[in-house]
Amino acid sequence: MDDKTQTGNIDVRLLELLVCPLTKGPLEYDAEHGELISRKAKLAYPVRGGIPIMLPSEARSLTE
């Protein structure tokens, strides 16, 4: 894949389809931490081996 279709380890097309399982809101990819961020739920879902782990029990709580 080229740079236009991939962001770090996440395919941009996949990122456009994924939503937070709790809020159904959009996600942002944080390449530095390898996480998908749900601002609305204040959770960070891990990405392991290029695979998003979309389980709330696996998510890290974001603190402000």
Curated annotation (Swiss-Prot):
Domain of life per record: Bacteria
InterPro entries: Trm112-like (IPR005651)
SUPFAM superfamilies, sorted: Trm112p-like
Cellular component terms (Gene Ontology): cytosol
Family stated for the protein in its record: Belongs to the UPF0434 family.
Protein name stated in the entry: UPF0434 protein Oant_3286
Taxonomic lineage of the native organism: Bacteria, Pseudomonadati, Pseudomonadota, Alphaproteobacteria, Hyphomicrobiales
